From Swiss-Prot:
Residues 94-104 have a biased composition (Low complexity). Residues 226-480 are annotated as: Interaction with LMNA. It comes from the Eukaryota. This is Sterol regulatory element-binding protein 2. Phosphorylated by AMPK, leading to suppress protein processing and nuclear translocation, and repress target gene expression. Activation by cleavage is down-regulated upon activation of SIRT3-dependent PRKAA1/AMPK-alpha signaling cascade which leads to inhibition of ATP-consuming lipogenesis to restore cellular energy balance. It comes from Mus musculus (Mouse). Residues 492-522 are lumenal. The modification Phosphoserine is found at residue 1087. Residues 1-50 are annotated as: Transcriptional activation (acidic). The lineage of its organism: Eukaryota, Metazoa, Chordata, Craniata, Vertebrata.
Amino acid sequence: MDESSELGVLETMETLTELGDELTLGDIDEMLQFVSNQVGEFPDLFSEQLCSSFPGGGSNGGSGNNSSGRGNNGGATDPAVQRSFSQVPLSTFSPSAASPQAPALQVKVSPTPPRATPVLQPRPQPQPQPPAQLQQQTVMITPTFSTAPQTRIIQQPLIYQNAATSFQVLQPQVQSLVTSPQVQPVTIQQQVQTVQAQRVLTQTANGTLQTLAPATVQTVAAPQVQQVPVLVQPQIIKTDSLVLTTLKTDGSPVMAAVQNPALTALTAPIQTAALQVPTLVGSNGTILTTMPVMMGQEKVPIKQVPGGVKQLDPPKEGERRTTHNIIEKRYRSSINDKIIELKDLVMGTDAKMHKSGVLRKAIDYIKYLQQVNHKLRQENMVLKLANQKNKLLKGIDLGSLVDSDVDLKIDDFNQNVLLMSPPASDSGSQAGFSPYSIDSEPGSPLLDDAKVKDEPDSPPVALGMVDRSRILLCVLTFLGLSFNPLTSLLQWGGAHNTDQHPYSGSGRSVLSLESGAGGWFDWMVPTLLLWLVNGVIVLSVFVKLLVHGEPVIRPHSRPSVTFWRHRKQADLDLAKGDFAAAAANLQTCLSVLGRALPTSRLDLACSLSWNVIRYSLQKLRLVRWLLKKVFQRWRATPATAAGFEDEAKSSARDAALAYHRLHQLHITGKLPAGSACSDVHMALCAVNLAECAEEKILPSTLIEIHLTAAMGLKTRCGGKLGFLASYFLNRAQSLCGPEHSTVPDSLRWLCHPLGQKFFMERSWSIKSAAKESLYCAQRSPADPIAQVHQAFCKNLLERAVESLVKPQAKKKAGDQEEESCEFSSALEYLKLLHSFVDSVGFVTSPFSSSSVLRSALGPDVICRWWTSAVTMAISWLQGDDAAVRSRFTEVERVPKALEVTESPLVKAVFYTCRAMHASLSGKADGQQNSFCHCERASGHLWSSLNVSGTTSDPSLNHVIQLFTCDLLLSLRTALWQKQASASQLLGETYHASGTELAGFQRDLGSLRRLAHSFRPAYRKVFLHEATVRLMAGASPTRTHQLLEHSLRRRPTQNTKHGEVDTWPGQRERATAILLACRHLPLSFLSSPGQRAVLLAEAARTLEKVGDRRSCSDCQQMIVKLGGGTAIAAS
């Protein structure tokens, strides 16, 4: 035995050990069971090789001379036998009688690649036999090779000597064959694929050797046994079938029939050949041959062999290679390839997982695909039914049709549940779940009979009427009341009676005129009867239209489940931004409720006309009271009437919310543009049904529906139906209550006069794709009220800043006193804006059950930040240092949405606020830090002027830019005046440095550039140009001319439009007076007392404006001039 052979054997056994440890037989059985169950559903994906059955059979043959022993035909295989060698130990046997000893025999075995060997189980079967004699013959067995790997010779001598002992080898599929006493040397040729490479030669004096294999042949030896050399060459077979036959001495061919689970039948012709290998032969000439079997060192009870027999050395550990090992290796290799392919399909090529995990994932994935397929089939079925009923059967309630058809489909579907459902991958899976869902997900409520109640069929009143039938009934009623055929019938009846009895009256007749004695009673009774009949007819029509004609859907019924499925799907589509899919689901909801949208102009005209009539009738309290009484009497018991009334109100509420959401999508432009009549129709439907729902709908939702209707009429109909928009707006305000207690915070701005004025002036627009704004957070794109609220917040911010940078108009043309100062107006606007901004996040979706639809997730932090920044600037201008410090903590926290935009205007405002805060610091470096922040803000402001044309809200951008530029120039002026005042105390003259002048000139250049596109900036240019000349110490003549431009008063009559924007305001005039009185020489003033008069006027103006810092400086200058108290009092 060479070393390479031993190393190869060891490597092969290690590979098989690793494969056995990684994949268990339980996983393989589970996968095979699952694949076999899927053959019916996926015939193209699975083959039926492992599922096919093989017929079984066996044949027994033998001689008639010797019938002392027969083998048992094992047609069926015991499952306990089909196990590995490690699980089935070999039973021991005990000798029953002593036998003569024989010399040891050696057997040469030619092994093949290793495979798992069949199960060996020796059983003691004592059978007395006559004494045997030994002869020597030679038998050569030469089977055909199909695949022949490299052959290795392994010496494995095993000798068993027993007088009366039968040795039995058990394997599946037993078959017996009885030989004749006379056996001649033959040659066995057989077409197989694999033959085990080990044989056992057993020498017995008088005994029987039985061999049971998958294709097992039982051989009964004759009394005379002779030793014949047998040469067996192994072959490669696909299964563990083995063939054993005996040799007859007469030379006749013997046919051995073999049955195997993988092969139908094998037939081996037996021929004689030259004797080459010695075997055991009985005394009467019978040749005994055995099947090749594997008996490992740890499987054979060698210790029970009689002591007289010489035992050879045990085989080495690396020599356990059998044909079954080869079969098992190929079997596992095939399984491994398929499992790797499954892993690549399910989890990808890069995933790493054990084979059992791959099988579980594959089973779960197939279950998931089945679940999705089932859901898609059900949704497709419902959508097809709804589409078909919309086109063909508009006058029939779709709910009942969906109910019956869905029941039929579900019954058909439930019959195939077990066929379509694969076996559970986890033994702990609960059976209560739907067979189409994975283990952790409950089944669909549409197929779960426990969740959907079997409600009785709705009564005829729940079917409803189409709008064409309603209009037709109204027209017939109107025509009947107009022509009044009952009056003609009564008159015809009275005339007929008069003709029959012309002179039978009780009164007198003068010139053929009869004077009846009945009086007023004769004509009053027919009139009362006529009005009574007409009233009954009209009331019946109202009951038919408003009570019996309304479709009602029972809760927990099949149509109700379908409605809620599509309603929730519409919520998810709206949250994801898929507005087309949401609109389709909402239309399906309306179809299920029996309120399909009109598809033709005739249907649209009838629906619109009926909704106008219905809205008019609902405003009549008498009609509502009569309908309520009739409705209560129509039901048998009060409890039944109350229950049906609740169901009717719930159905009306659901339909109203669906109409309202569709109307919002049409207004915001998320759907293809339709006609104005279609929008008015949806608005009226939502309003009518919401009012019918009464207490079932929230007051805030009812207010929102009326406001949306007003917006739709305002945007789509324009000035034609503007009065209707005002009516619905007033109606919404009346629903809020006298003290606006029921109005939600998100709609409170419409109750304010400024909000109403803004809404009615239509200075807003609803866009389908709202642009991102720097001044407000993004609102819900499908909510028109949120978009109008966003526009109103920006309008308030613009008004607040405009009151600071633009002059205020006078109350009257002849009134010399101007309005209140810009600071108070700006603060009032900012206060309103702050209150309206905080209430943005409390608005809910009309579908209150959905938590994913919100107009905003909280207050508008962006608009709040701008409010805090402008308020801080006003506080700094007023000289309120405490308010500046408190507001700076809010301004310092810039929202992330503004940081992401990287807007230079936002950075300019932020650094300006930091500069104002640093200027209040009492430290030595406070002014230097303020100057550095001013430089950074100046650079960002210049950048914003270059990109301002490409941003949204251009008017608001110009106002903010002008305000920021004015703040920077005012801050630079304040810093210069502080340094100049400190120098004057020391008796020195202070002139600004070149860096300060360069920064001031850069901001002044930004102001001039802004004035070219925004005219109100001119009112600031002259004042700041005069300031920079004073800082540089330039000639005072030109400086005085520039200041005169701000000091001069101008008449308001005969002024062109736009010139008022360039005039300086009150604060600019007071600031110019302070600069002139402080820095200009006295010779530039007209009279010696003019300076004190101008300072007194400036002090009154600054006090009125609220600029406490500048007013204090003015008072100090008046005191220095002397006599300032008397001048101020005058």
